């Protein structure tokens, strides 16, 4: 067996579909977006899109349509998944809780039938009498829409026309009527049929049209008054309704293919069209009123509006605003203007939604040397191509820094009474205090009257009645703002030194050894109210006011030396309300009361980087739900700050962390700074909404990223990136990319648009001694598109394209590696290519080119001709391993700097992927799954160890460990194969057993070892081992990690229990969704835990949690089994959430 945990680190971002309607209520205009398995529901407001709910479906959304049957006050949603689960959903809201109710559901799969090449088509009759589905060739499936039917029943009608391109229901017909484009040996034609529910068959339709344009691909049904249908082709747009036929062939649409459309007006007089190049058109239907008052179509007109992201779907919202959903680039909200701008465009982008898809390749690098990986992906395609830099955690963007060693604390001040913004920064050092004046972006040292500068400050700030306060080791000093003068001072009666202090706008608590004193701040007076003695010395304290307490805190939180406890005391009496023994020997160093998402918490940080956090009841002072995390290795200082009107906590240490709340769970996000000892929020004229941060040597002022888990930076390339690798010595990335050029009249080709490879700082072009240019069997014709491939050298800091190297005509760059070879000290970029000609079934020749980049120059060091396409290359024990068509070949690097073949392995169909570990090589084949080879250094050859005999069409492979191999195949499944070293017979040993099966529902393009999180966050009990990241076509980033058998069994038990408690949207069984499914077979999932389901445990209500844990046996590490509590599982699941 193999025990694995698979979880989403970034949900899919590519938009597959979008619809608008009135789903949440009759008044709301909603936008619904499908991102593969996720459904996002928005309300369209004057300010933009407001998210309402996100729903995870147990299936890939293939069809999504809103409709309103008679008698309904708002729209219902029909969804069909790729595994043929159909459901009708309704939105229900009661108070705060939002539910998506499944009104009806069923599976509409046929046992036999060939799935259509043009995919799944789902349509709804405008009168809501039926839903029509085209799933298989030669069959049209009908789901009658009866009011009260809970189960969706369907029947098939035979279609003589086997190859249907597109189909729609027509408007204004007595009986439901379909109109479709189909292909037969003579060409493409349009036909209509009436659907009879009673006879369950087709009747002759009102009209048909033979021999439409050969590329006709889309049907648009036009509402009344026009009725009929518009057929969209590559070169023409035609309108039919039986009586009338109108055709136009505007030259403007020929350049590219129209791929999506959307109706603007309810009466169908305007349609938006989007093409594959990201151009947006308006199709206008001009009307003509007849003598008898009827309206007929006079003319069709197409206008180019401008450019958007390459659209997968379009939907018109309101007031000239359109949502452009994209699969190949970022989605957009665009505004259509009445007048065009200087470039002649009517389109203005208002908002952009990040999409990582399609992730074609990626690599993990630790660019900031902090032990934390960043993921750099090759994302998007064509003009939407980009690199995306993804890191977990929060970035601080530095705006100013001053060399100031030894800072022990810092506070912002507003020095004058009327000021809204901070103008002063007070810095504390051992034995002294310094004051910095902020004037715009200038910073200068100054003195404040009434403040002392020869003592260390423990606290400083603005307090009530237009006063300032300074607490030093000697005294508490109250200073008036205008004029600046000391108005009151409090000292410990015996003159002892203050050791810790906390203050809010009207209260002060100071500790002198074991004694605590409570003071109140009045106009020009500090009034001592009470004092008490604790049994041990006070290590830290806090009186932050919570809730609506008018800035007064009724509670005081303290941490003590010696007994290592945290206590909540009542003010002013210092009565003990709660005592929490923290255990261990390490003293608490910082304590803080705070509120996240209207829940109150107590945070207590120890001197070794551990942090305890509790729920805090502000009425009773009681603590509950104790939890512990490890944030760093040094004493941690906790400070609050606000970002976008929410409170967050900054934990200063050698691993600075921002603590915030999401879905009422605390999230710990690391910050991209090496270490921070002290921080304070700063909001000055020159540095608005900033933070001031101090480490051992420097004071830095900066702004903080939006508080979220993953941060994504985009580097647009405007062409398609294919492969990426990182080269540390040159501090560069190598990227293979391709741009499209068009053959011009002179026989040369021109680029469609400026892009990374045409705008590099320097460039070079391949000239090869290996191939004479006359060998090209292919002549390109005028207007034909050709791909031009390049190696881009990109700076790791600025992401500037330093150099672009263009390959030969018809030469496609397929594989890339950065490595050292043999005893040669240089590091090379090595590219594998293929000469691609349309006439050849597979490439017959290619090259391996060795480049060196140094001192800003790219030099070709060596090239090697090969008889085929170099699909994959890896460095292998100082040699170069390459797969070329069906061969796996090992090259050694000679002292003459040439590649020499050492050995070959031939037993493959098409060897597309290579991964290595030690002397083992994993080969992923186009259709023959995976194969394990071992290299024998003594004999200098390959030995075939074992192979998986299942026919899996591979899309990516990875080695998990010495015995387990991970594969992804083209039906969206993951599997794990295991080497059976203990088998008794040779034959058994040669079989890789499939021990893990799982339906991911995503097409994986790339696996790589690495992690997005710091490697020591959380307690050491984290039950996972290793981390493999994967990137998919839909822009999802996931993670596979290995579990021990006992953890696997616990989580499997928990998964089964969760499936009983959590009701799936559309009533689709989790076990059905995750079962391994190809055209050949369906098998239940095994060897994988669905991490997304496990993590959803944290989002369910407490009673449901109790239901999940009832009688669950759990080993807490002592080796003894006991019944688990909800808190045990919360802790387990929170640990698991920290691996991504």
From Swiss-Prot:
Instruction: Give the region (Interaction with CDT1) as residue ranges.
Output: 2-768
Q: Which residues carry this modification: N-acetylserine?
A: 2
Q: Please give the residue ranges the record annotates as the region WD repeat beta-propeller B.
A: 391-708
GO BP, sorted A to Z:
apoptotic process; biological process involved in interaction with symbiont; cellular response to UV; DNA damage response; ectopic germ cell programmed cell death; epigenetic programming in the zygotic pronuclei; negative regulation of apoptotic process; negative regulation of developmental process
Where does it primarily localize? cytoplasm
Chain positions covered by the region annotation Interaction with CDT1 and CUL4A:
771-1140
Query: Where do the record's region annotations for WD repeat beta-propeller A lie?
Result: 13-356
One family name in Pfam for this protein: Beta-prop_RSE1_2nd
* Residue numbers of N6-acetyllysine PTMs: 1067
**Pathway(s):** Protein modification; protein ubiquitination
Q: What does this protein do?
A: Protein, which is both involved in DNA repair and protein ubiquitination, as part of the UV-DDB complex and DCX (DDB1-CUL4-X-box) complexes, respectively. Core component of the UV-DDB complex (UV-damaged DNA-binding protein complex), a complex that recognizes UV-induced DNA damage and recruit proteins of the nucleotide excision repair pathway (the NER pathway) to initiate DNA repair. The UV-DDB complex preferentially binds to cyclobutane pyrimidine dimers (CPD), 6-4 photoproducts (6-4 PP), apurinic sites and short mismatches.
Q: What is this protein called?
A: DNA damage-binding protein 1
Species per Swiss-Prot/TrEMBL record: Mus musculus (Mouse)
């Amino acid at each position: 067996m193999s025990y694995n945990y698979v979880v989403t680190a970034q949900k899919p971002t590519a938009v597959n579909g979008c619809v608008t309607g009135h789903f949440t209520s009759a008044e709301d205009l909603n936008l619904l977006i499908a991102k593969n398995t996720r459904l996002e529901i928005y309300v369209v407001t004057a300010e933009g899109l407001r998210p309402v709910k996100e729903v995870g479906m147990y299936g890939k959304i293939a069809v999504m349509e809103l409709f309103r049957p008679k008698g309904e006050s708002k729209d219902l949603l029909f969804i069909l998944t790729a595994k043929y689960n159909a459901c009708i959903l309704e939105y229900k809201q009661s108070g705060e809780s939002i539910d998506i109710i499944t009104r009806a559901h069923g599976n509409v799969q046929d046992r036999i039938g060939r799935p259509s090449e043009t995919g799944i088509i789902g349509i709804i009759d405008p009168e809501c009498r039926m839903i029509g589905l085209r799933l298989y060739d030669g069959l049209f499936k009908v789901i009658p829409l009866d009011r009260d039917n809970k189960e969706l029943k369907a029947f098939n009608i035979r279609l003589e026309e086997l190859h249907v391109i597109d189909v729609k229901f027509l408007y204004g017909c007595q009986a439901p009527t379909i109109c479709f484009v189909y292909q037969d040996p003579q060409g493409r034609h349009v036909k209509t049929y009436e659907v009879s529910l009673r006879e369950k068959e087709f009747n002759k339709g009102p009209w048909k049209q033979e021999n439409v344009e050969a590329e006709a691909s889309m049907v648009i049904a036009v509402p009344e008054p026009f009725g009929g249908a518009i057929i969209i082709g590559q070169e023409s747009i035609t309108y039919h309704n039986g009586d009338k036929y109108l055709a136009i062939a505007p030259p403007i649409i020929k350049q590219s293919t129209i791929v999506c459309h959307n109706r603007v007006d309810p009466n169908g007089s305007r349609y938006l069209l989007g093409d594959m190049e990201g151009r947006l058109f308006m199709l206008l239907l001009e009307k003509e009123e007849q003598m008898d008052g009827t309206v007929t179509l006079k003319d069709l007109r197409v206008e180019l509006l401008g450019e958007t992201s390459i659209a997968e779907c379009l939907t018109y919202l309101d007031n000239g605003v359109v949502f452009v959903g994209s699969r190949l680039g970022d989605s957009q909200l665009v505004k259509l203007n009445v007048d065009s701008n200087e470039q002649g465009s009517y389109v203005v982008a208002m908002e952009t939604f990040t999409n990582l898809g399609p992730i074609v390749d990626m690599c993990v690098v630790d660019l900031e040397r902090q032990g934390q990986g960043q993921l750099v992906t090759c994302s998007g395609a064509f003009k939407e191509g980009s690199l995306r830099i993804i890191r977990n955690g929060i970035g601080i963007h530095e705006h100013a820094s001053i060399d100031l060693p030894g800072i022990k604390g810092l506070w912002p001040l507003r020095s004058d009474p009327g000021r809204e913004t901070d103008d002063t920064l007070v810095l504390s050092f051992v034995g002294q205090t310094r004051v910095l004046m902020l004037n715009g972006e200038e910073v200068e040292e100054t003195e404040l009257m009434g403040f002392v500068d020869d003592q260390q400050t423990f606290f400083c700030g603005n307090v009530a009645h237009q006063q300032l306060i300074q607490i030093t080791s000697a005294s508490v000093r109250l200073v008036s703002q205008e004029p600046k003068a000391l108005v009151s001072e409090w000292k410990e009666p015996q003159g002892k030194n203050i050791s810790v202090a906390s203050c809010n706008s009207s209260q002060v608590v100071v500790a002198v050894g074991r004694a605590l004193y409570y003071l109140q701040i009045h106009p020009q007076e500090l009034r001592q109210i009470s004092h008490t003695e604790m049994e041990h010395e006070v290590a830290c304290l806090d009186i932050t006011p919570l809730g609506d307490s008018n800035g007064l805190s009724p509670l005081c939180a303290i941490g003590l030396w010696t007994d290592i406890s945290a206590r909540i005391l009542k003010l002013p009496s210092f009565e003990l309300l709660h005592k929490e023994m923290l255990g261990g020997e390490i003293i608490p160093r910082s304590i803080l009361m705070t509120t996240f998402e209207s829940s109150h918490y107590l945070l207590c940080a120890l001197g070794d980087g551990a942090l305890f956090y509790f729920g805090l009841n502000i009425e009773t002072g009681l603590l509950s739900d104790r939890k512990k995390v490890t944030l760093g290795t040094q004493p941690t200082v906790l400070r609050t700050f606000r970002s976008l009107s929410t409170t967050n906590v900054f934990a200063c240490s050698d691993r600075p962390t921002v603590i915030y709340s999401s879905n009422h769970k605390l999230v710990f996000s690391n910050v991209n700074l090496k270490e921070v000892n002290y921080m304070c929020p700063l909001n000055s004229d020159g540095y608005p909404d900033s933070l001031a941060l101090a480490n051992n040597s420097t004071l830095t002022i900066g702004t903080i990223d939006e508080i979220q888990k993953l941060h994504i930076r985009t580097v647009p390339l405007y062409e398609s990136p294919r492969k990426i690798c990182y080269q540390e010595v040159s501090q560069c990335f190598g990227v293979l990319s391709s741009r499209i050029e068009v053959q011009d009249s002179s026989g040369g080709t021109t680029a469609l648009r400026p892009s990374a490879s045409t705008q590099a700082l320097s460039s070079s072009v391949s000239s090869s001694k290996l191939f004479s240019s006359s060998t090209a069997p292919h002549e390109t014709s005028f207007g034909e598109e050709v791909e031009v491939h390049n190696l881009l050298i990109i700076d790791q800091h600025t992401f500037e394209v330093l150099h672009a190297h263009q390959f030969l005509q018809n030469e496609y760059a397929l594989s890339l590696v950065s490595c050292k070879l043999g005893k040669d000290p240089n590091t090379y970029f090595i590219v594998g290519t293929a000469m691609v000609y349309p006439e050849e079934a597979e490439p017959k020749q290619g090259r391996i080119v060795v480049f060196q980049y140094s001192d800003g120059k790219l030099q070709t060091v060596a090239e090697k001709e090969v008889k085929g396409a170099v699909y994959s290359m890896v460095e292998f024990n100082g040699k170069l391993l390459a797969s070329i068509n069906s061969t796996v070949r090992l090259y050694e690097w000679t002292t003459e700097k040439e590649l020499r073949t050492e050995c070959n392995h031939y037993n493959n169909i098409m060897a597309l992927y290579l991964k290595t570990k030690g002397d083992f090589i994993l080969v992923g084949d186009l259709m023959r799954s995976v194969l394990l080879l071992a290299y024998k250094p003594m004999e200098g050859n390959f030995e075939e160890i074992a192979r998986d005999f299942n026919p899996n069409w591979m899309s990516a492979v990875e080695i998990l460990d010495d015995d387990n191999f991970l594969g992804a195949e083209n039906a969206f499944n993951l599997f794990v194969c295991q080497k059976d070293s203990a088998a008794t017979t040779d034959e058994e040993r040669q079989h890789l057993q499939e021990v893990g099966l799982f339906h991911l529902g995503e097409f994986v393009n790339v696996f790589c070892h690495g992690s997005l999180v710091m490697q020591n966050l959380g307690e050491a009990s984290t039950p996972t081992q290793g981390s493999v990241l994967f990137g998919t076509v839909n822009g999802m980033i996931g993670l596979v990690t290995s579990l021990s058998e006992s953890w696997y069994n616990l989580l499997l038990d928990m998964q089964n229990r969760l499936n009983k408690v959590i009701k799936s949207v559309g009533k689709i069984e989790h076990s059905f969704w995750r079962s391994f499914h190809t055209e050949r077979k369906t098998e239940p999932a095994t060897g994988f835990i669905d991490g997304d389901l496990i993590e959803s445990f944290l989002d369910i209500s407490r009673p449901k949690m109790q239901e999940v844990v009832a009688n669950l046996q759990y080993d807490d590490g002592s080796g003894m089994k006991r019944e688990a509590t909800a808190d045990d599982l919360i802790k387990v699941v929170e640990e698991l959430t920290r691996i991504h």
